[in-house]
Every structure is written in C-alpha cells, then in structure tokens.
C-alpha cells in the first residue's frame, strides 16, 4: 500500500486525507487523481475479467461539496461490487457535485438507481441518481443543405478519427436537401470527445463554412422487458402533406383493423396498435417503403422513464402538458428559421438538442370531440410525465415547444366551440403588432444581415432550491465563434422558469452583449452591471449603445460565463452533465 502515499495519488494534503487512506487500506482499491477527477478502483483488486458492459455505470448528483469517497463508497458497497468510482473535483479540493459509479453488472446498477435516488445522504440533502450514458455522438451544425450523407461521412472521416456513421435527416419541406446539421457517431466516447475538441469553432471549416459542434443527446437505452411490451410505432420522414388517414390506411393494409389511432406531427407520426404482434409485423413490412413519395422509417417507440439519464442531463425540460390520458409522447422539435413567417414552431424529430416537451393524448377516440386545442404559451416541462407515473414514448429529442390540452394553472387554455362560432383561417403573425419584434427574431435578422450564420440555441437545465426546474439557453453565432473561439457561447447570467422565456432572455442578453439595445435592455444592463460589481470586481459591461470591440465582446461573454457558473455553484444543484468526465472535454 506504499504507493498510495505518494504525492501523485491524489490524497496528500486533501480534505479528509486520513479517512480516505483508511478506506483504501480497508478495501485495497487504488485512489488516484487525474484530469480533474479522482478515480477509485477501475479495476478493483483481483479483477481478472473484462470491464463491465455498457449499462453498469450510474450517475450520482446533488452531492454535498464536502462529501467524499469515505462516505459514498460504503453506501454503494451495500448494493453491489464497485468496479470503479470517478468523483469530479474542483481546484479547491471540493467535489463538483456529482460522481460516476460503475458496478460489476447491470442488475446491481439498476438496484443502485432504485435505492439511492432521493436517498437522504445528509440532513435535508437528497441524492439524484440515474443511469449514465457513454455518449459517442456529436451534433454538427452549419452543414450546407445540399450535401448528401456520403459526402458528409467522407468529410468527417478526413478531419476526425474514429468515425463510425453519420446520421442526416432530410428537410421536412424539401426531401432533396438536409436540415443543415448531422449527427456523427464515433467508435468510443474518447474518440468523440477528441473530435469535439478538434472541431471547436474557428479551427476547422467544412466546405468553407463555419460549423457549430456539441454533444448530441445520448441515445436512450430501454431494457428489453420494457421494449417487449411496446405496441406503438414511430414513423419518420413523412411528407408534410401526408395525412393521418393516409398513414392509418397504409398500416391497416398489413392487417385490417389493427391500428387504433394515428397522431402525426409535421413529418413524423405515432401509430398505435391494439397488440404488439401487429405492430412488429407492420414495422417489418413498411420500414423503408415509399409512402406518398417519401421513403419512411418505422421503429418501435421508446418508453422514457422519469428517472432516466435524460432528466438529469443539461438539456432536459421543455414545454409539457397536464392532460390525464393513456400515453405521454416525448416529441423531438427543432425550430426551423425558414418558416418564421408562419409565426409558429416547426415540428420534426431529429436527435438534436436536449429538451423533451410532452404531448398527451386521451385513451379513447372522441375525447376532444367538443374541444378546441389552443396553444399554451408556457408550462412546466415533463409535468405530464410525472403525473403519469413517469412513462412516456420517445421518438427523438430536440428543442421547441409542446402543446397543452388542459391543466396549465397560469390561465385557461381550452374553450368550448359554441354553435354559431365562425372559424376563420389566419396568419399567426397578424396576431401581433407588425412593428414589434421579439429578441430572437431581431438577433436572427442581424445575423443574416452580417452573414454571421444562423444562431444556434442550446438548452440547459438546473433544479432550483424549491426543486423547480429552471432553464437557460446558450447561443452560438457561427461566424463570431470562428473569429473568437474562446468567447462563445453567449451565456446569460440568469435562469428562467419557462423555456420560451429563457430563449427570449438569451437572445436579449446576446443582443446587449453585441451592443444592440432591446426593449428593457437598459434595465437588464444595469442589473448585470450590479451583479458584476458584487460578484466579479474589475469586470465592465460594454455600453449597450456604443460599438462593441473584440476585446469588449470577449470580456462580456467571459463575464456571462462566469456569472452563470457563479449562480449555478452558489444556488442551484445543477445537472449540466453531457457525458462521461474522463478529461477529454466532456463537460
């Protein structure tokens, strides 16, 4: 055990050094600090087998900052054999609020999640525990829409190593074009992390275009027992003009009367079957078939548990619903700037960003026969999922908005259609005065005029002191990021209770940082300046009406990042974890 007393073992001079040395003396495990984390075991003493398979690692969050392995290891040992624990550490010797624990098998990991989630580790301090995901997928934005999958795959293999596959989705409006982004799959998390570091904006361009790169939402893994009971199909790559009736007819052709109902959202749909056998048969028969001029992809919908890793990662949240019904669908949604004139969000289902809005449908047809569904301006994300015992159906994840049928306490959203009412078609844009533009629209127009590229919004989430989910958007402007790679993304200093408010606030903050005044901008700038004076002496916020220099821009964006980190560290037990923390830029 002498090696454990060397200066490089991560223990000398640390907090609770005596307790930690007693722990490794008792267990025989090694404890070494490297790359901002302290690793216990991996492998444990006497381990001669291969490392545990994927799915054996759990994420433990909401750790008290002064809690260390001497308290956490004995707790985990009661559940199963620990292969490895990795605790993230800061420069002050405290933990960063979370750790990863790998058990010897999946059953132990599953039991650990059940037993340790919401476990009171100290008086009033509850742990947040969920499955960890070994993310191997990157999101790459800014790709020319005319490029094909084979071209993108070839280009990514030229600039990065370990590329396994590229996922490209056709445009909802024009199937001959892509959506301007792709998902790149790598052979390992390490390969993906190294590629992400290499592809940071400003370092590499694709076809002469600046690109935006970030972690994609990890693919949700569902156990076989749960998937064996699924009888709902997810159908994507539909034409916008394809109707629910057409989809139902096509799937009923496999077995008449097998389909219970169909729900289509823009270019994807969920098809409900009365039994699983019919669903599987239809999936095998229709996957890849051309429907209404477009080849469709058909898969089983994936149930999402309320305690899944998705809830704890940086992008969780969104706009949800409260209707009591049979199913909850998690809808992948991305706002398409090419259709802003419609005044409404555009729905499709790429595996893009990480918000998970929900849409509920009743268990029986005709439930809404005398109701009008009116779009809800905002509602707590995943509320409906929690209300239904934590089960939803996942197509893919993305950001955007949900639709509420009922249950929003902010104001009534449903009204009866009364006799004599006339429903008049109209453009939603006409509902607002034409002279007033929201901050996201202003930011988009400015980026277009200056050829900066489309702003990329990244949704993040944190849990407030009252256990309320809060949201924050980070904004990356491709051209500015390529010119000043060290100062992106634009990170506002405050979180919002609603996703739409967070997006507007992020756009306002970005405009103010760029020196462009917005409605209420003076007050926001003054508030920011006050926060700066209190928390970060020496920082200065650029005048909102004066031209902004590169130095001011860098200083202001750095300030925003520091303020966000300060707020998160001091107030909110955040779960801004995108993947593993092995020192390769995963966070």
UniProtKB/Swiss-Prot annotation:
Keywords: Cytoplasm, Endoplasmic reticulum, mRNA processing, Nucleus, Phosphoprotein, Repeat, RNA-binding
An example Gene Ontology biological process: protein stabilization
Location of this chain's protein in the cell: Nucleus; Endoplasmic reticulum; Cytoplasm
Xref: SMART domains: RRM
Pfam families per UniProt: DND1_DSRM (PF14709), RRM_1 (PF00076)
Primary localisation category: nucleus
Residues forming coiled coils: none
Modified residues (Phosphothreonine): 491
Gene3D superfamilies, A to Z: 3.30.160.20, 3.30.70.330
PROSITE patterns: RRM
Domain spans labelled RRM: 56-134, 136-218, 231-303
InterPro entries noted in UniProt: A1CF_DSRM, ACF_RRM1, HnRNP_R/Q_splicing_fac, Nucleotide-bd_a/b_plait_sf, RBD_domain_sf, RRM_dom
Region (Required for nuclear localization), start-end ranges: 360-409
An annotated Gene Ontology molecular function: single-stranded RNA binding
GO CC annotations, alphabetized: apolipoprotein B mRNA editing enzyme complex; cytoplasm; endoplasmic reticulum
Record NCBIfam families: hnRNP-R-Q
Domain text: The RRM domains are necessary but not sufficient for binding to APOB mRNA. Additional residues in the pre-RRM and C-terminal regions are required for RNA-binding and for complementing APOBEC1 activity.
Role, per record: Essential component of the apolipoprotein B mRNA editing enzyme complex which is responsible for the postranscriptional editing of a CAA codon for Gln to a UAA codon for stop in APOB mRNA. Binds to APOB mRNA and is probably responsible for docking the catalytic subunit, APOBEC1, to the mRNA to allow it to deaminate its target cytosine. The complex also seems to protect the edited APOB mRNA from nonsense-mediated decay.
Subunit structure, as described in the record: Part of the apolipoprotein B mRNA editing complex with APOBEC1. Interacts with TNPO2; TNPO2 may be responsible for transport of A1CF into the nucleus. Interacts with SYNCRIP. Interacts with CELF2/CUGBP2. Interacts with RBM47.
Cited PANTHER family: HETEROGENEOUS NUCLEAR RIBONUCLEOPROTEIN
Protein name from the UniProt record: APOBEC1 complementation factor
Organism: Pongo abelii
Gene this protein is translated from: A1CF
């Amino acid at each position: 055990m002498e090696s454990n007393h060397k200066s490089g073992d991560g223990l000398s001079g640390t907090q609770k050094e005596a307790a930690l040395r007693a722990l490794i003396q008792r267990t025989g495990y090694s404890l070494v600090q490297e790359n901002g984390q302290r690793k216990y075991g991996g492998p444990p003493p006497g381990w001669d087998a291969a490392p545990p398979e994927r799915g054996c690692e759990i994420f433990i969050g909401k750790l008290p900052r002064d809690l260390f392995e001497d308290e956490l290891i004995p707790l985990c040992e009661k559940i199963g054999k620990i292969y490895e624990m990795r605790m993230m550490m800061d420069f002050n010797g405290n933990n960063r609020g979370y750790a990863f624990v790998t058990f010897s098998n999946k059953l132990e990991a599953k039991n650990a999640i059940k037993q340790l989630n919401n476990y009171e580790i100290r008086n009033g301090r509850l742990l947040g525990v969920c499955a960890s995901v070994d993310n191997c997928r990157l999101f790459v934005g800014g790709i020319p829409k005319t490029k094909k999958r084979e071209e993108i795959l070839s280009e990514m293999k030229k600039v990065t190593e370990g590329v396994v596959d590229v996922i490209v989705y056709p445009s909802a409006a024009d199937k001959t074009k892509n959506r301007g982004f792709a998902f790149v799959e790598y052979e390992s998390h390490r390969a993906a992390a190294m590629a992400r570091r290499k592809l940071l904006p400003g370092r590499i361009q694709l076809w002469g275009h600046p690109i935006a790169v970030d972690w994609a939402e990890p693919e949700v893994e569902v156990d076989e027992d749960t998937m064996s009971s699924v009888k709902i199909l997810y159908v994507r790559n539909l034409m916008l003009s394809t109707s629910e009736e057409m989809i139902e007819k096509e799937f009923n052709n496999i077995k008449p009367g097998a389909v219970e109902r169909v729900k289509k959202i823009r270019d994807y749909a969920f098809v409900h079957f009365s039994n699983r056998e019919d669903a599987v048969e239809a999936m095998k028969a229709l996957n890849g078939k051309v429907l209404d001029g477009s080849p469709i992809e058909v898969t089983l919908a994936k149930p999402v548990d309320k305690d899944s890793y998705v809830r704890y990662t940086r992008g969780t949240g969104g706009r949800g619903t409260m209707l009591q019904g049979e199913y909850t669908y998690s809808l992948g949604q991305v706002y398409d700037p090419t259709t802003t004139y419609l005044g409404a969000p555009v729905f499709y289902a790429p595996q893009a960003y990480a918000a998970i809005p929900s849409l509920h449908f009743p268990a029986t047809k005709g439930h809404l026969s005398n109701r009008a569904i009116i779009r809800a301006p905002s509602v707590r994300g995943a509320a409906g999922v929690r209300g239904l015992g934590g089960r939803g159906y996942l197509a893919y994840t993305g950001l955007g908005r949900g639709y509420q049928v009922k249950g929003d306490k902010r104001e009534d959203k449903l009204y009866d259609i009364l006799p004599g009412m006339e429903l008049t078609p109209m453009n939603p844009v006409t509902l607002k005065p034409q002279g007033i533009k929201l901050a996201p629209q202003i930011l988009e127009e400015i980026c277009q005029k200056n050829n900066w590229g489309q702003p990329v919004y990244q949704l993040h989430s944190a849990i407030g002191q009252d256990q309320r989910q809060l949201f924050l958007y980070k904004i990356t402007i491709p051209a500015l990021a390529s010119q000043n790679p060290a100062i992106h993304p634009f990170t506002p200093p405050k979180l919002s209770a609603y996703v739409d408010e967070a997006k507007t606030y992020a756009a306002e903050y970005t405009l103010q940082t760029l020196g462009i005044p917005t409605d209420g901008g003076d007050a926001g700038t003054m508030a920011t300046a006050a926060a700066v004076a209190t928390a970060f002496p020496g920082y200065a916020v650029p005048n909102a009406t004066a031209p902004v220099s590169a130095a001011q821009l860098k200083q202001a964006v750095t300030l925003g990042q520091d303020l966000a980190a300060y707020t998160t560290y001091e107030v909110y037990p955040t779960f801004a974890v995108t993947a593993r923390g092995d020192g390769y830029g995963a966070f």
